[in-house]
């Protein structure tokens, strides 16, 4: 369990200096300004890489105007502020700053005084809680910690939730860090951070998106999905966000996508973002985007292109959601047991009554694109009315559960409901087995839709769609198209290797045409397996159904590459 005094170590991912310099340049913390007149904050300074770069710029600002840095020491105490919770990181950052200041000729007492003014060991989320009376900063920069909620002590997360309105659903800790950082901006302040892009699209980020769009102005975004901006590898895709207070009067938002990080790419990015100078047309290392309007409310941020955004909006306005009454599709997730090693069994290897066993399909079973069943079953401890079975009626199952009682009772679901200690986390509905459905794995870099004619119960790593008013084969064909992948790509979090999350929250955003609107010819072609084997031919049919022009489907396919 992570406590208030140790969570930062679980989110410690340090930023490469080239990225630090890019962020400082984009926020405007540059040595051509009189930086002693500005306040800069790093809310989670880690090993001090942002603070080191900021101090160099502060000193250069003085030197280029003919000052010796220690001449103005009385003016420097409020220029820098760094917060760090973890003692080990705090001490490392302190040592780094000592070395920097020694290089500028400060005496030991001067160094100690400055550093004591500049850095604080504290929990940023509990620091300056009253933002109406808090010190305000002209620049807030850094790399907020990436820590999952479940790693935080219950009492501490309750404090955070009470204080930060953006903590929603299972929001990671960088979300309230961003909120508090924004709250501490001065009237003309600028935030420049590098963090996961998950909040821009997924469910848990919706309140932060609304908080930003209602109260601040997004200025620049640098999409770093395919680069390595940190000293250690991360699985979530990072991006740089530069956000200003509402007092900033320019509405244009500029964004950059790059697959490499080099000095030239960083310079090209700055030239475009700061001065609208586009890079050489021959350069394939960087793509640029301009938005005359930003997204409203809690809408997902789709930065890849204005054209993609316009196409998506037209599709959203023209076609109903997949679970709308006109479709009557249902999206569900498979069963979570809390102890798969106990609840998922091979009937040939255990002595359990067959009445409580349901055939189970897993992600591994559908990896080939069709079901190749492993023979596994899941134990169903529920009656048809949703209550738990009486174990005395199933003596062999009772003996089996008693053999594994310690594992079963150690699950959270059992601890919360001791009288129902042998239930699975999710209730099991046996009737699902016999319903035709489409199976979709959680993470994939392409649409992977496998039909189950009505023989299996899905495992919890699988989402499934009940076809409702649709012919299941026609629905599967449409879901395999680039148009449907475009919906997922637009809304879903991307992981390493261009992997998309095909979670229920994103699947539910898919738009479908009215099944009655399809012609007989379109239906026949979509039911032809040869069509599904040709992505290009399939996409041409589905584009026709969605009333997309040849240019529009090409824009979609280019974006997905």
Swiss-Prot record:
It is an enzyme of class 2 (transferase). Pfam families: Eco57I, TaqI_C. Its EC number is 2.1.1.72. GO terms for biological process: DNA restriction-modification system; methylation. Keywords: DNA-binding, Methyltransferase, Restriction system, S-adenosyl-L-methionine, Transferase. One of its GO terms (molecular function) is DNA binding. It catalyses: a 2'-deoxyadenosine in DNA + S-adenosyl-L-methionine = an N(6)-methyl-2'-deoxyadenosine in DNA + S-adenosyl-L-homocysteine + H(+). Signal peptide: none annotated. Belongs to the N(4)/N(6)-methyltransferase family. This is Type II methyltransferase M.BstVI. It comes from Geobacillus stearothermophilus.
């Amino acid at each position: 369990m992570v406590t208030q005094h140790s969570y930062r170590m679980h989110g410690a991912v340090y930023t490469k200096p080239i990225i630090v310099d890019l962020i400082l340049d984009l926020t405007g913390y540059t040595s051509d300004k009189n930086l002693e007149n500005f306040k800069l904050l790093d809310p989670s300074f880690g090993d001090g890489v942002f603070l080191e770069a900021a101090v160099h710029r502060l000193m250069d600002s003085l030197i280029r105007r003919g000052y010796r840095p220690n001449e103005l020491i009385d003016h420097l105490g409020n220029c820098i502020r760094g917060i760090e919770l973890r003692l080990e990181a705090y001490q490392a950052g302190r040592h780094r700053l000592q070395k920097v200041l020694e290089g500028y000729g400060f005496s030991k007492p001067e160094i100690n005084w400055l550093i004591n003014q500049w850095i604080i060991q504290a929990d940023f989320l509990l620091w300056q809680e009253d933002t109406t009376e808090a010190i305000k900063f002209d620049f807030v920069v850094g790399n907020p910690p990436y820590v999952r909620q479940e790693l935080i002590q219950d009492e501490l997360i309750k404090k955070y939730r009470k204080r930060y309105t953006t903590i929603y659903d299972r929001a990671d800790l960088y979300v309230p860090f961003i909120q508090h950082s924004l709250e501490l901006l001065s009237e003309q302040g600028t935030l420049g951070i590098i963090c996961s892009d998950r909040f821009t699209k997924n469910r848990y980020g919706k309140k932060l998106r609304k908080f930003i769009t209602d109260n601040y102005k997004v200025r620049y975004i640098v999409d770093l999905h395919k680069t390595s901006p940190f000293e250690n590898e991360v699985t979530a895709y990072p991006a740089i966000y530069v956000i200003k207070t509402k007092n900033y009067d320019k509405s244009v938002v500029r964004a950059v996508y790059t697959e490499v990080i080099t000095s030239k790419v960083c310079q090209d990015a700055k030239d475009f973002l700061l001065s609208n100078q586009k890079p050489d047309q021959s350069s394939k290392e960087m793509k640029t985007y301009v938005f005359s309007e930003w997204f409203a409310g809690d809408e997902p941020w789709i930065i890849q292109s204005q054209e993609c955004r316009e196409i998506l909006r037209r599709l959203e306005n023209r076609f109903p959601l997949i679970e709308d009454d006109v479709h009557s599709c249902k999206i569900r997730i498979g069963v979570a047991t809390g102890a798969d090693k106990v609840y998922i069994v091979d009937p040939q290897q255990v002595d359990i009554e067959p009445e409580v066993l349901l055939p189970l399909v897993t992600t591994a079973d559908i990896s080939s694109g069709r079901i190749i069943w492993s023979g596994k079953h899941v134990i169903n401890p529920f009656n048809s009315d949703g209550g738990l079975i009486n174990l005395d009626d199933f003596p062999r199952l009772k003996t089996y559960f008693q053999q594994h009682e310690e594992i079963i009772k150690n699950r959270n679901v059992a601890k919360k409901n001791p009288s129902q200690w042998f239930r699975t986390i999710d209730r099991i509905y046996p009737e699902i087995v016999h319903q035709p459905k489409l199976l979709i794995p959680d993470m994939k870099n392409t649409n992977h839709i496998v039909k189950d004619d009505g023989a299996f119960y899905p495992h919890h790593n699988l989402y499934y769609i009940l076809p409702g008013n649709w012919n299941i084969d026609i629905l599967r064909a449409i879901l395999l198209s680039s148009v449907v992948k475009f919906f997922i790509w637009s809304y879903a979090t991307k992981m390493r290797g261009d992997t998309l999350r095909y979670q229920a929250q994103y699947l539910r955003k898919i738009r479908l045409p009215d099944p009655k609107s399809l012609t007989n010819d379109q239906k026949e072609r979509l039911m032809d397996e040869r069509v599904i084997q040709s992505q290009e031919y399939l996409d041409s049919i589905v584009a026709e159904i969605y009333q997309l022009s040849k240019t529009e489907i090409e824009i979609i396919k280019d974006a997905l590459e």
